[in-house]
């Protein structure tokens, strides 16, 4: 079962270029240095169209990448850059004629219900329309159609969040530590996508060197770093990385095996 993964956004909560910054990366003419807020789209062949997070930039990301359908949404956590595009999902409700399933851990589901109370409160007046979201709390592996989804526990600072594995592909953003139980879930990967914010230490994100250490332990065929800030220029940083490791960029497409033969 093959799928196409598209990086809708590979930047931080600020995005790149960052407002008011005149550094070399923020002024770069390399399109790979223009990073919107973090999200990916997974389009499974003859299967579901899956969003991972609804970023602040979702509307433009969907238009740029010509996404015509969303069958499910996976949330990693509830920080603004990962959820604040949720209202834009309502256009897919209109086109598809029904609610869209969404999946999140217990804390994130609670945060979504509070932050978007107008969506989840049935007494809210419709006005110009509200998203229809069928929100499920994740308690373990689950299926979206024929696609097996394996949640991967992560830490974003002290906060537990989720990454996801589909087949031989894993997406681990916004993390600075993997608990012991996460490592066995990453065995046999072909492609690993991993948070790598910058070179300087950060309390809630992997640095480039820390992310390289994780990749060395997991040993996928290929690793892509995401959630990069303006301290990492694409061309310069990419040239310094070892074989089998690259920076992702907005619009990058990967072909993955989304089957469940790894379980």
Would you name each region that the model predicts?
Residues 11, 55, 176, 197, ...:
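Anionic group-transfer/hydrolysis microenvironments
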Residues 139, 179-263:
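Binuclear metal-ion centers of metallo-dependent hydrolases, dominated by the metallo-beta-lactamase
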Residues 33, 55, 175, 201-208:
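A conditional alpha-helix N-cap/helix-loop micro-motif detector
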């Amino acid at each position: 079962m093959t799928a196409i993964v598209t990086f809708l956004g590979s930047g931080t909560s600020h995005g790149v270029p960052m407002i008011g910054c005149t550094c070399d990366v923020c002024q770069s003419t390399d399109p790979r240095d223009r990073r919107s807020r973090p999200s990916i789209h997974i389009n499974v062949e003859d299967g579901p169209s899956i969003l991972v997070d609804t970023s602040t930039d979702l509307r433009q990301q969907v238009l740029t990448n010509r996404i015509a359908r969303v069958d499910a949404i996976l949330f990693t956590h509830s920080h603004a850059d990962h959820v604040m595009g949720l209202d834009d999902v309502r256009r897919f409700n209109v086109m598809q004629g029904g609610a869209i399933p969404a999946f999140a851990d217990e804390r994130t589901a609670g945060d979504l219900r509070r932050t978007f109370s107008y969506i989840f409160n049935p007494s809210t007046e419709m006005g110009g329309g509200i998203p229809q979201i069928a929100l499920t709390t994740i308690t373990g592996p689950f299926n979206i159609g024929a696609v097996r989804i394996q949640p991967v526990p992560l830490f974003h600072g002290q906060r537990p969040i989720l990454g996801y594995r589909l087949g031989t592909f894993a997406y681990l953003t916004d993390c600075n530590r993997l608990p012991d139980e996460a490592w066995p879930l990453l065995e046999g990967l072909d492609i690993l996508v991993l948070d790598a914010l910058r070179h300087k230490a950060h309390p809630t994100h992997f640095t480039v060197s820390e992310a390289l250490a994780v990749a060395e332990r997991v040993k996928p065929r290929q690793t892509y770093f995401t959630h990069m800030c303006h301290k990492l220029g694409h061309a310069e940083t990419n040239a310094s990385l070892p074989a089998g490791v690259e920076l992702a960029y907005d619009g990058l497409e990967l072909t993955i095996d989304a089957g469940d033969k790894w379980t």
